Amino acid sequence: TKQADACRIDLMDLSYENPTPLQFWAKADGTFRNVALFSGDYDVTPTEGPFFPVEAERVHLKGVTKHDFKVTPFLKVNIEEIVYGEPGSAEVTVKYTIRRSTTPEGMTIGQKTISESRLLCNIYPVVSCYNSCYIEENSTTKVLSRSTDASIESRVYEDPVKNLKSGQKYYIRVAALSSCSYNSTLKRYNYTPVIEIVAP
């Protein structure tokens, strides 16, 4: 089943002369597990994730096999500071930065690829742009497609976490979208880790 905030794993079973790709979806955290495969050699490729394309890697499966892929995310998003208001104010401001990753050798992308940022808030520790995993009235979206990537990378953005209730626990993270992901069947965001806050 197609998963939001995940990637697809393509496997080519090399025991066949003209193999049909076997496909399954990783979890949102990038881990994947498939217990329905036979031992043998496979070419394995992670694809349709928020990262630049990678070459297939040859994997020999025998019993429980662990294999890690190294990928380069489209964007690196960092929360630089969380600023809390006075006690009772229920005010929280998040400062964050967005940077492009180094484009892999042999690839060319434009100068206006960062299209959107989102400060997401939820009352549960699962926070995502998809599957109703954020509270809209507490979250903020910025359209960045009119700015150059260079100007975006030079800034520290500040967004409020809106409409909070003093003393309540929330979970926040920042997401950013690159137009490099638009050829995917579903836009893929790069995220910061989830951070727990308590509204002052």
List PLM regions with ranges:
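Short amphipathic, basic-aromatic surface patches that mediate peripheral association
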Residues: 1, 97-110
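Short, acidic Ser/Thr/Gly-rich low-complexity loop/linker segments typical of extracellular
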Residues: 14-29
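A short, solvent-exposed beta-strand micro-motif common in secreted/extracellular proteins
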Residues: 30-51
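Structured interaction patches on ligand/partner-binding surfaces of diverse proteins
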Residues: 49-74, 181-182
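Beta-strand-rich modules
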Residues: 160-184
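Structural beta-strand segments of beta-rich domains
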Residues: 88-94
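Short beta-strand elements
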Residues: 181-200
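Short, ordered, surface-exposed loop/turn motifs in non-cytosolic proteins
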Residues: 1-17
